[in-house]
């Protein structure tokens, strides 16, 4: 019997494998995998459109596979839009997938305005047909009607309603003679190019519950963008702005959350913040420049620089928690509080009078490279008064030129929960916190939650009273 050398068998095996890869698998037991069985779009505002999401269709076989049909079940009438392997349209027929290969289907959604006030659901599916099988990828989006304001100037007294959110595109300006009043429960979403510029007056009248607070944030609500700092510019109280008041407001994910420029034009503070949360601002949470700000029972957290007060001004912070932790978005490299009486113009320090007071506050940071969380700088001979009373702070070098009374230094305030990996922060106080009962009576009856301060022998430090 004639024998063949081993190399012949190797060649024959290679030919067999090659032929197999060039042939199509036709059985119903062919393997098709999806990178996801559902694409979920978080809140999509009507008329604005969504981000693009994608799903991968994978041929898990060692032979070619013919996808006889990849189609959007709602067809051209669907609110979803497909791009199948680079070709736009609701359907593609007879798509060949090589052995082990895959293709991408890109999906967006555009939702028409309707009459619903509450969020509503929009659904469809993608059918993938092959070898007599039909499998489906589910598509789901939350739609939300809204008031849309593009490059808008408010030039007369205006009160918004809270039935629908407001989406700001291109910017919103409150003119010098106008007052904008935003009521409890209103939600305001800003596009990346949309600051709120206040030349007149802004009145925010929120309430203590999450559903009745007033929310200011970016308009990207899908993951992971919903928590990105710097997703919108922020709120700017400019030189002519007067009598601004924000109560139970949440300002999050801005570049500079609150900026107050120049002195008040009357005896009242330019900006009064009561029971507000300023969170996750990329550059600064509160930035004051020769201005006047009064803040009580406020939380300023996890910003590039939480509070920066420069070039003098008049500032009063009472029962505020000012805390920052390095996290997935912002490295903690700056003190949580910086106060100075000057700015540098060219090579010259220009000074202005400074009067700043901090009572019953917590200044803390961690997981960064900051050793002094409070920094105070003075130049020149202009009036300079910076006073701290009954505060807990993290400082290795106590600032010079200040007065301080009953301070607690470098003792962990024992916040309830800080989990940077999960981006979860609860700045309530644990039992046994050194901040409990260490404050003085300031006449403020309630904390940030709206709970009474009259618990224990004395008020607690920070924005939350341990109940």
Where on the chain are the PLM-derived regions?
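Short, solvent-exposed loop/linker segments at beta-strand-coil boundaries, enriched for Pro/Gly
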Residues: 73-91
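Beta-strand/loop edge motif enriched in small/polar residues
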Residues: 20-25, 32-43, 48-50, 54, ...
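Asparagine-centered strand-capping/turn motif at beta-strand->loop junctions
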Residues: 57-61
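Short acidic/proline- and small/hydrophobic-mixed sequence motifs that coincide with surface turns
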Residues: 50-51, 62-67
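Cytochrome P450 C-terminal beta-domain/meander region
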Residues: 449-453
């Amino acid at each position: 019997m004639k024998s063949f050398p081993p190399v012949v068998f190797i060649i024959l095996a290679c030919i067999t494998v090659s032929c197999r890869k060039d042939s199509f698998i036709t059985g119903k037991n062919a393997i098709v995998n999806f990178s996801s069985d559902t694409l979920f779009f978080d809140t999509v505002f009507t008329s604005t459109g969504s981000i693009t999401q994608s799903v991968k269709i994978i041929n898990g076989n060692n032979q070619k596979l013919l996808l006889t049909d990849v189609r959007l079940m709602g067809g051209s009438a669907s609110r979803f839009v497909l791009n199948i392997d680079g070709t736009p349209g609701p359907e593609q027929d007879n798509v060949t997938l090589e052995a082990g290969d895959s293709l991408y289907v890109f999906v967006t959604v555009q939702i028409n305005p309707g009459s619903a006030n509450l969020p509503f659901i929009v659904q469809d599916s993608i059918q993938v047909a092959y070898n007599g099988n039909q499998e489906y990828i589910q598509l789901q989006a939350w739609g939300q009607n809204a008031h849309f304001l593009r490059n808008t100037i408010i030039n007369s007294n205006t009160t918004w309603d809270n039935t629908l959110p407001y989406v700001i595109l291109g910017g919103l300006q409150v003119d010098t003679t106008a007052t904008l009043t935003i009521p409890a429960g209103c939600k305001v979403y800003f596009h990346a190019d949309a600051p709120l510029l206040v030349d007149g007056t802004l009145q925010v009248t929120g309430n203590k519950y999450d559903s009745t607070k007033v929310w200011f944030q970016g308009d990207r609500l899908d993951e992971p963008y919903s928590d990105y700092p710097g997703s919108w510019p922020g709120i700017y109280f400019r030189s002519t702005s007067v009598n601004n008041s924000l109560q139970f407001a949440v300002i999050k994910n801005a570049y500079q959350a609150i900026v107050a420029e120049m002195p008040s034009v009357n005896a009242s503070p330019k900006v009064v913040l009561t029971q507000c949360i300023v969170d996750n601002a990329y550059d600064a949470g509160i930035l004051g420049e020769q201005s006047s700000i009064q803040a009580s029972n406020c939380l300023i957290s996890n910003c590039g620089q939480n509070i920066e007060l420069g070039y003098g001004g008049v500032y009063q912070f009472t029962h505020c928690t000012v805390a920052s932790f390095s996290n997935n978005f912002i490295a903690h490299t700056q003190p949580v509080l910086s106060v100075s009486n000057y700015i540098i113009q060219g090579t010259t320090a220009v000074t202005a009078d400074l009067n700043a007071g901090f009572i019953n506050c917590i200044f803390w940071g961690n997981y960064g490279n900051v050793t002094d969380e409070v920094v105070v700088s003075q130049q020149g001979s202009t009036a300079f008064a910076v006073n701290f009373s009954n505060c807990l702070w993290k400082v290795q070098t106590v600032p010079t030129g200040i007065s301080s009374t009953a301070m607690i230094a470098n003792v962990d305030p024992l916040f309830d929960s800080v989990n940077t990996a999960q981006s979860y922060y609860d700045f309530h106080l644990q039992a046994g916190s050194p901040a409990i009962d260490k404050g003085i009576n300031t006449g403020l009856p309630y904390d940030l939650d709206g709970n009474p301060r009259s618990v224990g022998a004395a008020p607690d430090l920070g924005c939350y009273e341990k109940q």
